[in-house]
Amino acid sequence: MNVWTTLFVAPLVLAAPVGMAGPAAAGPYDGSRPFLCAVTAIMECAASGECERHIVTDETAPAIIKVDVPGQTISTGTARRSALKSAARVDGQLILQGSENGRGWSATIDEETGRMAVGLVDNDYTFSLFGACSLP
């Protein structure tokens, strides 16, 4: 079983709509238009405290993620498309969240620089993803 697919892609399959909040003036990654994010690093940590770094490849994890807050979706290069559960703008950060199958995830994207960090949480392990976003 591919743990990445189970933990990252599956939890993104959500059903609730997104509501944006925050001031009108913001950076290019404020969620007002779609953008792409490249995953550059993945860390998997077990409940035992052992961690392992994973190489990002399209076979084990999506290297590119499309974030479309107005369309309320996150999608990968495959046919996978997921609804966002919540989105908020807080102190210059776009924060996206969701949950499914007993797992939760949260992504924080800097509105000015596009730097991204994602946390995926399960009872037995966590994944931390890092990357950078760009406008298409």
Name each model feature, range by range.
Residues 1-11:
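Bacterial N-terminal signal peptides that target proteins for export
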Residues 14-23:
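C-terminal segment of classical bacterial N-terminal signal peptides
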Residues 22-34:
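Cleaved targeting-peptide boundary
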Residues 31-71:
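Short, solvent-exposed loop/hinge segments that bridge or flank secondary-structure elements
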Residues 67-71, 89-93, 108-117, 135:
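Short, solvent-exposed coil/turn segments at beta-strand boundaries
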Residues 69-105:
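Contiguous, well-ordered beta-strand patches that form the walls/edges
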Residues 107-109, 116-130:
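Short, exposed beta-strand-loop hairpins at the edges of beta-sheets
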Residues 130, 135-136:
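Glycine-rich, low-complexity intrinsically disordered segments
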